[in-house]
Regions:
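An extended acidic
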Residues: 1-82, 155-184, 250-276
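C-terminal capping/lid segments that line or modulate ligand- or cofactor-binding pockets
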Residues: 1-46, 310, 321, 356-357, ...
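Low-complexity, Ser/Thr/Pro/Gly-enriched N-terminal "stalk/linker" regions
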Residues: 1-9, 62, 163-164, 179-182, ...
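Short Pro-Gly-centered flexible turn/kink motifs
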Residues: 66, 115, 209-229
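Helix-terminus loop motifs that line ligand-binding clefts
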Residues: 66-71, 78, 291-305, 312-313, ...
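Polysaccharide-binding surfaces and accessory modules of carbohydrate-active proteins
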Residues: 78-80, 84-188, 203-205, 237-261
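Extended ligand-binding clefts on enzyme/binding-domain cores
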Residues: 157-178, 268, 276, 349-356, ...
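Active-site acid/base region of carbohydrate-active enzymes
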Residues: 165-179, 267-293, 339-364, 375, ...
């Protein structure tokens, strides 16, 4: 339940599953409107040979290998069937310049005899995630293509073999009126040629190949996407005119160009991590919409709290994803993310829980009423990290135009909110939801990010000549730090508290050992790396979780039951947490310890480099979603820390 291959151009995003089949098809936003996200929306691939059809996702004798071999977001899938003596090799991409998904299919006959092999390519959409059964599919004889459309979404499907189009097709219904889908029409090797359906529709193409012994043939297949049938057909025609080899070559060149800032650093990256370093950056880019949203994960197999997926833009995940890009000198992605946050900011200066890729408010399980306390359903750290990241970006690109665009209209209201969202009794930030989205309290983690955000805002105020705000925000940050020293360290246990709530003037302290408290205080400078509190917290954490160079995996916190593999363990390993520990180790010169963590994360990634949200400590299996943008970001950040230590 992961995506071994993801492909994207910031508008069309395709995720392939463990059978090499389309499982996610987002358009026109990365992470929003998944037209192939349902359980029965697999785009099946099959071969008809020796009198029977074999589907890649049904016949258990197919074996698969996945990789990104080209230093570009071009996936390679190899499917082999020993009994049928057939190999299917797919070179897949989403075109960098236009919204079309391309598959260059290499059909290899391993037999000692010449054979007729029929390749079936099937597609099923629920356009715009609609359950209204109002999609239409039609055969377009003048274009040698099939068209699926609903409203302002249109997909044109076609292909060729040696310059000739597919030789048969059919359009059908699935999931309604007793129909399973048009792919059932392929079981005798022949398609009926039904040319139109409306409702819940799917379609299938056939390519008939005569393949000599120990030889091969190629089939080109594509799905173009448009906001109208005219646009989708224009892209289809453009692809036919250019040829898919030219488009794949142009896409590879685009990715090489995009990777240029990272390639400049590559000589300094330890050889063992170079491939995953580059793959992580490309995978992160694949999760970024061209209008600024940074999606947590486009892997739709994971339903968060069993009701929703991770295909939203959390400002926190976006901030952490952009940190290594900012350090590498990227400009476009951070700028567009800040524009996205600017558009989504509440009039009171805070950011909400999460957003859809189109900028609308995302679903939430956080209430406005918390017992008798009324408070916005937010996580304060998400506002603070955007202020902090903007200051990091400005430090890399000190441009007066940046302040003109964002200082008065975004930084000032955000920093004012942070400075005033403070509990008068404790001096700490008021309660909000923690970064794990579970607990309403004042956490050490959120306090740390708020402190750093206010200091960052004060530094920006100096540059903007805004003396009054500079004094106010710096004072607020210093007061919060002093309150944290007073309240947030558990001297008895020798570790930071997870957080606290104040009831009738008395603190109710949460003593859970939460690794975000330790590493948040470290990353955002709330406590010095060599302070007594930090040193003792790391020692307590190391002992509590029995962490070592041979077992560097760490959970989020003790007794974390979220998707826990077994009640016998305290929680699943999270690469994010382990990599934070590696960053702490590098700060203290422990390169060996950091290397152990990097090896651990690399060894648990998929063959294409996908890093998941969690790892099962019992069988070392990746736990979806994969990829998780934040996991990849922390891997890249750790590598950059390692380079800086040198």
């Amino acid at each position: 339940v992961a995506r071994p291959i993801v492909l994207s151009n910031g508008e069309l995003h395709v995720g392939l599953n463990k059978f090499g089949l389309v499982h996610d098809f987002y358009y026109p936003y990365v992470g929003f409107e998944n037209h192939a996200g349902g359980a029965n929306l697999r785009h099946k691939v099959g071969v008809y040979v020796d009198g029977a059809v074999s589907w890649l996702d049904e016949d258990p004798k197919w074996s698969f290998r996945f990789e990104y071999p080209h230093t570009a977001l071009i996936g390679h899938t190899r499917a082999k069937h020993e009994d049928l003596n057939i190999i299917l090799e797919f070179d897949d991409c989403v075109d960098s310049d236009m919204s079309v998904f391309i598959r260059n299919v290499h059909v290899v006959n391993l037999s000692d005899e010449s054979r007729e092999i029929k390749l079936f390519m099937h597609q099923a959409f629920a356009i715009s995630e609609s359950g209204s059964n109002t999609d239409t599919a039609q055969y377009l004889p003048d274009s040698d293509a099939l068209l699926h459309y609903r409203g302002r979404r249109a997909f044109v499907i076609s292909g060729d073999h040696n310059g000739d189009p597919f030789d048969q097709f059919s359009i059908g219904l699935f999931g309604i009126e007793g129909h399973e889908g048009s792919y059932k029409d392929a079981e005798d090797g022949e398609l009926s040629g039904n040319s139109v359906e409306h409702g819940r529709v799917d379609s299938i193409l056939r390519f008939t190949l005569n393949v000599p012994a120990q030889s091969s043939e190629r089939v080109h297949y594509w799905v173009s996407a448009g906001m109208s049938t005219r646009e989708a057909l224009y892209i289809h025609k453009q692809l036919q005119d250019d040829g898919i080899h030219e488009r794949i070559h142009a896409t590879a060149a685009w990715w090489h160009s995009w990777l240029a800032p990272a390639l400049k650093q590559l000589d300094a990256v330890p050889v063992a991590y170079r491939e995953l370093f580059l793959h992580s950056l490309m995978i992160m880019k694949s999760q970024m919409d061209k209008r600024g949203a940074v999606i947590a994960s486009t892997d739709s197999t994971m339903l968060n709290y069993s009701r929703d997926a991770y295909a939203y833009s959390w400002p926190r995940d976006g901030g952490f994803a952009l940190w290594p890009l900012i350090r590498l000198g990227y400009t476009d992605e951070p700028y567009r993310f800040f524009e996205f946050c600017h558009r989504g900011m509440h009039p009171s200066g805070y950011l909400m829980h999460k957003y859809r890729a189109d900028g609308a408010l995302g679903s939430s399980w956080h209430p406005y009423l918390h017992g008798e306390t009324v408070a916005p359903p937010i996580q304060e750290d998400e506002t603070a990290i955007v202020v902090f990241m903007f200051s990091q970006y400005y430090a890399m690109h000190p441009d007066a135009g940046l302040l003109k665009d964002f200082y008065s209209s975004m930084i000032v209201p955000m920093a004012e909110f942070l400075a005033e969202f403070v509990d008068s009794e404790s001096g700490l930030p008021k309660p909000s939801y923690d970064l794990w989205e579970q607990d309403f309290m004042t956490t050490t983690y959120s306090t740390s990010v708020t402190y750093a955000g206010l200091l960052a805002a004060a530094d920006l105020a100096v540059i903007a000549g805004d003396h009054a705000h500079e004094v106010k925000w710096r004072t607020a940050a210093e007061d919060i730090q002093q309150a944290a020293r007073t309240h947030l360290f558990n001297t008895e246990r020798g570790v930071f508290y997870k957080g606290a709530r104040w009831e009738n003037g008395q603190p109710v302290l949460d003593t859970t050992l939460d690794n975000s408290s330790i590493f948040g205080a470290f990353l955002f400078g709330l406590f010095a790396p060599d302070s007594d509190e930090m040193t003792r917290s790391i020692a307590t954490m190391t002992e509590q979780f029995a962490v070592s160079n041979t077992q560097p995996g760490l959970p989020r916190y003790e007794n974390d039951d979220y998707r826990r593999s077994d009640d016998s363990i305290t929680g699943n390993y999270w690469p994010i947490i382990s990599l934070w520990h590696a960053q702490y180790k590098l700060e203290h010169g422990d390169v060996e310890g950091a290397t152990a963590v990097l090896d651990f994360v690399k060894d648990h990634a998929l063959t294409t480099g996908m890093i998941s949200e969690q790892i099962n400590p019992l069988d070392n299996e990746a736990i979806a979603p994969a990829p998780l943008t934040w996991s990849h970001a922390e891997f890249v950040s750790t590598i950059l820390d390692m380079i800086e230590r040198k």
